[in-house]
């Protein structure tokens, strides 16, 4: 069996396993990823030093999955892996490195962890399981803020002067470890400084950034209850305060063991962090959506008529955007009687310092079918047009909650003259005998007003636009509320 450099037979598995996989890039809908390289280092959580390392190229079952797009991404060519070991050959070593340890990496919950589980499933073996996870993308987005830009590993490395990202597993793992140490050091220093020094030394997006950052350091949903109560663990082993429980993270989409109050935090971490900043289609003239013309009833939609195509961003533009149609009509949905699963989550800010508002709703079967067909149509066109971005599914599986799928609805911001506002109209449904009417509550609601209305279990009618995006290697469809009618 392959051995890890420095591996000893007797170990307490207290080390943190930083790992990364390099893969092929799917070029058609339904195609999976194939692992081309696995790299890992084991880190002492007390001294933050690398103890052991392992890196290996992997030969996929189908070498034709290695395309020019994947070579451009990671530099791994067909000839590099033709004589390499298969994943089945290295599975014992990978299992021994990962199982029962804390896993760490950048965006591992959405990418690397699923790839490991898929690879073990393909060879008919149970996958390794972590005792905790540290996803530096979600962690640093929450704690370090947007001062380093888009929070991609290459951007963070540039911010700290660590050189260029090679997109090779062992190099990326070591870079991830260094970035995490740098960020942790900055946050530790900031937690000890007066507010006015932090305000003078850190570029902020809102006046609340400093105090919010200090509150986050003191108490975070990623921090264990013991840390929050006593601070003892954070004093002895600071990096362990970053660990999320394995119970909550075994499956990045399995929320069955989470408490309802922390579930919105987990769901929020899946949001592409700035895609709406580059979707110019969101900034439109102020118009009322009080009439329902153009929004289609679900029972009148034939999923076979849903299509996606590229259209000009605006009349006369040479820039193209992806748009969904039902036949020849732009697809917009009228969705009655939606139930709110998780209320407004507005902890992230856009570049203008405004809270980004979204909430999660349960999907009934007819709506779920329409959204899945939209996802499939848009992803097909995206892949066919040469996009190598990771696709974020529109429908979110929610195992453990009667297996009811969910989706996230975004509240847009729009420019009306010189005034920024939240653009979804909010109405209240009122009944007089057998007659139902809609009373306009606000056409430019404040964040606090929206937050107070959209509580869990609230029932509402939603008038939604579907807005595909492809930004910073993340692509998908956003459901955007144009009008909400509260029951």
UniProtKB/Swiss-Prot annotation:
<feature type="binding site">
    <location>
        <position position="22"/>
    </location>
    <ligand>
        <name>Mg(2+) 1</name>
    </ligand>
</feature>
<comment type="function">
    <text>Probable exonuclease involved in enuclation of sieve elements.</text>
</comment>
<feature type="active site" description="Proton donor/acceptor">
    <location>
        <position position="167"/>
    </location>
</feature>
<dbReference type="Pfam" id="PF00929">
    <property type="entry name" value="RNase_T"/>
</dbReference>
<keyword id="KW-0540">Nuclease</keyword>
<dbReference type="GO" id="GO:0003676">
    <property type="term" value="F:nucleic acid binding"/>
</dbReference>
<dbReference type="InterPro" id="IPR012337">
    <property type="entry name" value="RNaseH-like_sf"/>
</dbReference>
<keyword id="KW-0460">Magnesium</keyword>
<feature type="binding site">
    <location>
        <position position="20"/>
    </location>
    <ligand>
        <name>Mg(2+) 1</name>
    </ligand>
</feature>
<dbReference type="GO" id="GO:0004527">
    <property type="term" value="F:exonuclease activity"/>
</dbReference>
<protein>
    <recommendedName>
        <fullName>Protein NEN2</fullName>
        <ecNumber>3.1.11.-</ecNumber>
    </recommendedName>
</protein>
<keyword id="KW-0269">Exonuclease</keyword>
<dbReference type="InterPro" id="IPR036397">
    <property type="entry name" value="RNaseH_sf"/>
</dbReference>
<feature type="region of interest" description="Disordered">
    <location>
        <begin position="269"/>
        <end position="291"/>
    </location>
</feature>
<feature type="region of interest" description="Disordered">
    <location>
        <begin position="200"/>
        <end position="233"/>
    </location>
</feature>
<dbReference type="GO" id="GO:0005634">
    <property type="term" value="C:nucleus"/>
</dbReference>
<dbReference type="GO" id="GO:0005737">
    <property type="term" value="C:cytoplasm"/>
</dbReference>
<feature type="binding site">
    <location>
        <position position="172"/>
    </location>
    <ligand>
        <name>Mg(2+) 1</name>
    </ligand>
</feature>
<keyword id="KW-0378">Hydrolase</keyword>
<keyword id="KW-0539">Nucleus</keyword>
<keyword id="KW-0963">Cytoplasm</keyword>
<dbReference type="InterPro" id="IPR013520">
    <property type="entry name" value="Exonuclease_RNaseT/DNA_pol3"/>
</dbReference>
<feature type="domain" description="Exonuclease">
    <location>
        <begin position="18"/>
        <end position="179"/>
    </location>
</feature>
<feature type="binding site">
    <location>
        <position position="20"/>
    </location>
    <ligand>
        <name>Mg(2+) 2</name>
    </ligand>
</feature>
<dbReference type="GO" id="GO:0046872">
    <property type="term" value="F:metal ion binding"/>
</dbReference>
<keyword id="KW-0479">Metal-binding</keyword>
<feature type="compositionally biased region" description="Polar residues">
    <location>
        <begin position="221"/>
        <end position="233"/>
    </location>
</feature>
């Amino acid at each position: 069996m392959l051995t890890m450099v420095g591996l000893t037979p007797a170990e307490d598995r207290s080390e943190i396993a930083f790992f990364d996989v390099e893969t092929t890039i799917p070029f058609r809908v339904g195609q999976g990823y194939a692992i081309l390289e696995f790299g890992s280092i084991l880190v002492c959580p007390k001294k933050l030093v690398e103890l052991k390392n392992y890196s290996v190229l992997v030969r996929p079952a189908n070498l034709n999955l290695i395309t020019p797009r994947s070579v451009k991404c990671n530099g791994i060519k067909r000839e590099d892996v033709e004589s390499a070991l298969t994943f089945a050959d290295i599975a014992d070593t990978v299992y021994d490195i990962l199982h029962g340890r804390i896993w760490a990496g950048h965006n591992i919950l959405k990418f690397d962890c699923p790839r490991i589980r898929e690879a073990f499933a393909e060879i008919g073996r149970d996958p390794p399981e972590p005792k905790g996870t540290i996803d530096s993308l979600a962690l640093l987005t929450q704690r370090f803020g947007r001062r380093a830009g888009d929070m991609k590993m290459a951007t963070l490395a540039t911010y700290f002067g660590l050189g260029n990202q090679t997109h090779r597993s062992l190099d990326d793992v070591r870079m991830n470890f260094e970035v995490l140490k740098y960020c942790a050091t900055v946050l530790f220093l900031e937690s000890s400084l007066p507010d006015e020094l932090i305000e003078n030394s850190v570029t902020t997006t809102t006046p609340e950034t400093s105090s919010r950052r200090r509150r986050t350091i003191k108490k975070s949903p990623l921090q264990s209850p013991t840390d929050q109560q006593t601070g003892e663990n954070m004093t002895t082993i600071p990096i362990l305060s970053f660990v999320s429980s394995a119970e909550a993270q075994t499956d990045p989409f399995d929320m069955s063991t989470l408490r309802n109050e922390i579930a919105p935090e987990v769901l929020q971490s899946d949001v592409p962090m700035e895609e709406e900043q580059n979707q110019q289609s969101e900034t439109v003239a102020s118009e009322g959506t009080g009439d329902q013309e153009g929004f289609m009833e679900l029972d009148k939609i034939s999923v076979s008529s849903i299509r996606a195509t590229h259209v000009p961003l605006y009349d006369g533009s040479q820039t193209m955007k992806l748009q969904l149609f039902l036949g020849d009509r732009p697809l917009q949905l009228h969705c009655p009687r939606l139930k709110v699963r998780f209320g407004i989550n507005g902890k992230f800010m856009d570049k203008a310092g405004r809270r980004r508002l979204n909430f999660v709703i349960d999907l009934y079967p007819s709506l779920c079918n329409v959204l899945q067909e939209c996802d499939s149509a848009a992803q097909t066109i995206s892949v066919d047009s040469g996009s190598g971005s990771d696709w974020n599914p529109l429908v979110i599986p929610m195992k453990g909650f009667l297996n009811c799928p969910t989706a996230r609805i975004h509240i847009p911001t729009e420019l009306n003259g010189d005034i920024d506002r939240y653009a979804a109209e909010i109405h209240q449904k009122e009944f007089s005998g057998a007659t139902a009417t809609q009373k306009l509550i606000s056409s430019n609601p404040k964040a606090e007003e929206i937050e107070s209305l959209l509580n869990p279990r609230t029932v509402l009618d939603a008038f939604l636009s579907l807005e595909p995006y492809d930004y910073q290697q993340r692509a998908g469809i956003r459901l955007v509320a144009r009008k909400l009618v509260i029951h």
